[in-house]
């Protein structure tokens, strides 16, 4: 497999507060997201707006309504990304280590009741992509996949 590159598969996890009654949550408000990235295509206001819209649309598709007043849930998200430069073993005899560069992105979405610091729902998505541009394209879909795991009952 000379010249092939292997990256780990995307990793997704969702945690819920077992004591929370999700049937009572009818409205939400998305707050300003937190982005920590040295990738300009990810760390910018336009991308934050795009991701916020994606999260909002996905929640409405799950039956929640965006609050005009006090919401049942505050939705916060954060993104961190890091460029990784490493090496991988050569693919055959006499082939030395090959450079391997990729970008790791971590998307966290928290849903919290007003006045509470602890989330009732947390989704975490880790995405490894060959470039920051590819991560930029994938993160909104990653957010949709996380919200798809939200159960309102």
Where on the chain are the PLM-derived regions?
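Short beta-strand
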Residues: 66-68
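A structural "domain/chain start" motif
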Residues: 5-57, 61, 70-71, 83-85, ...
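Surface-exposed beta-strand edges and their flanking turn/coil or helix-capping segments
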Residues: 27-29, 42-45, 74, 88-90, ...
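Sec-dependent N-terminal signal peptides
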Residues: 1-3
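C-terminal/domain-edge helix-coil "capping" segments
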Residues: 9-23, 102-106, 113-153
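Surface-exposed short loop/turn segments
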Residues: 12, 62, 71-120, 126
């Amino acid at each position: 497999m000379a010249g092939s590159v292997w990256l780990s598969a995307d990793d997704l996890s969702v945690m819920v507060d077992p004591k929370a009654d999700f049937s009572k949550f009818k409205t939400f408000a998305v707050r300003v997201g937190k982005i920590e990235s040295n990738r300009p295509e990810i760390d910018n206001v336009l991308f934050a707006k795009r991701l916020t819209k994606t999260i909002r649309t996905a929640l409405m598709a799950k039956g929640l309504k965006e609050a005009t007043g006090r919401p049942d849930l505050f939705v916060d998200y954060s993104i961190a990304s890091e460029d990784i430069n490493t090496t991988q073993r050569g693919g055959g005899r006499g082939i030395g280590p090959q450079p391997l560069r990729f970008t790791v992105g971590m998307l966290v979405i928290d849903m919290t009741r007003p006045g509470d610091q602890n989330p009732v729902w947390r989704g975490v998505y880790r995405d490894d992509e060959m470039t920051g541009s590819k991560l930029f394209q994938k993160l909104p879909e990653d957010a949709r996949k996380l919200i798809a795991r939200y159960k309102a009952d």
